[in-house]
């Protein structure tokens, strides 16, 4: 198979108690994922940058009782290029790594840093990128001690990026690869988000497969989901409105959109088969069985065919 394991995500919030968590874990377990990707911010296990011991005990017991394997997705707001709160950003990442260790997760996904125009104007881009590299090396040391791999994820052109209020170098997967190559740490790799890359290719006009191919040797984890490759430039926040027009990061099951997933994966020369999280929007929770089946079918088809060089 193209992937060593195929799982899915649990992105619903459970910060007000734990009502529904055990039931949702059981529903996911019945769908047969190899793992479930959980978000510490949605489980309420981090408070002020540190693990909340009481909350961790409650949530951790439920996660372990479900007898599932896990990966972890760091809070979305973690930004290792934010020099104004750099210590706190590193604390949240490190707490996420320790949370992963507690629940037996081997992969921790972290978004690449972003430059916020108004806040970061007094810092050069290179200073910010250097700060991110240093933070990732430091976190990589901790990850290595804990037996965890950090996978840094590429992003997509959401509205603040399109407007120029935020600059995110990782919308070009090849630039993310350059940064992670420069980090040069065995516990730090890339999470290739295929849906994000497809949206970025459609908006910026780069070659989708070529850009993704630049990351292949560093990919440790994949976020696999589908969309219609149409950037959302409207101000409408409701996901239901985006779906009607097929806009933005829809997080559909593989095959429901227009991304050439099979073609891409046939051209990706992974040095080792990465884990694959079929990352669906919370509104599509009921489609997890379909999504897992589709991802496994793609993986089998790709593995059965001769790879195609880029």
Model-predicted segments: where are they?
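Hydrophobic residues within beta-strands of alpha/beta enzymes
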Residues: 36-38, 108, 150, 222, ...
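Flexible, glycine- and charge-enriched loops at secondary-structure boundaries
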Residues: 21, 49-52, 86, 90, ...
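Active-site-proximal loop/turn and secondary-structure-junction residues that shape catalytic pockets
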Residues: 12-14, 40-44, 76-78, 112-116, ...
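Histidine-acidic metal/acid-base catalytic patches
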Residues: 1-5, 14, 18-30, 106, ...
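N-terminal pre-domain/capping segments
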Residues: 1-105, 189-191, 296-310
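Hydrophobic residues in well-ordered beta-strands that form the structural core
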Residues: 72, 150-152, 192, 278
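Short, basic/glycine-rich phosphate-binding loops at helix/coil junctions
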Residues: 70, 156-157, 241-246
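Active-site acidic/histidine proton-transfer and metal-coordination neighborhood
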Residues: 62-65, 82-189
């Amino acid at each position: 198979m193209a992937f060593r394991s195929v799982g899915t995500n649990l992105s619903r919030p459970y910060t007000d108690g734990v009502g529904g968590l055990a039931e949702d874990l059981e529903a996911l377990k019945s769908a047969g994922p190899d793992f479930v990707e959980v978000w510490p911010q949605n489980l309420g296990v981090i408070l002020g940058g540190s693990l909340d011991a009481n909350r961790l005990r409650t949530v951790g017991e439920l996660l372990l009782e479900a007898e599932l394997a896990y990966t972890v997705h760091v809070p979305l707001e973690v930004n290792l290029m934010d020099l104004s709160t750099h210590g706190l950003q590193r604390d949240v990442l490190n707490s996420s790594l320790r949370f992963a260790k507690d629940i037996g997760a081997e992969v921790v996904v972290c978004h690449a840093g972003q430059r916020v125009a108004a806040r970061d104007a007094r810092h050069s881009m290179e200073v910010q990128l250097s700060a991110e590299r240093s933070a990732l090396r430091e976190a990589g040391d901790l990850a290595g001690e804990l037996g965890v791999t950090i996978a840094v994820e590429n992003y997509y052109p959401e509205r603040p990026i399109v407007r120029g209020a935020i600059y995110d170098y990782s919308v070009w997967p090849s630039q993310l690869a350059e940064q992670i190559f420069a980090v040069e740490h065995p516990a730090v790799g890339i999470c290739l988000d295929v849906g994000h890359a497809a949206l970025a290719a459609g908006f910026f006009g780069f070659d989708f497969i070529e850009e993704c191919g630049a990351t292949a040797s560093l990919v440790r984890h994949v976020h696999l989901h589908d969309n219609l490759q149409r950037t959302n430039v409207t101000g409408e926040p409701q996901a239901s409105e985006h779906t009607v027009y097929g806009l933005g990061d829809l997080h559909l099951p593989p095959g429901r959109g227009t991304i050439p997933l099979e073609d891409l994966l046939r051209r990706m020369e992974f040095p080792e088969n990465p884990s694959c999280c079929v990352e669906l929007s919370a509104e599509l929770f009921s489609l997890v069985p379909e999504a897992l089946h589709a991802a496994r079918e793609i993986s089998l088809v790709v593995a059965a065919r001769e790879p195609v060089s880029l």
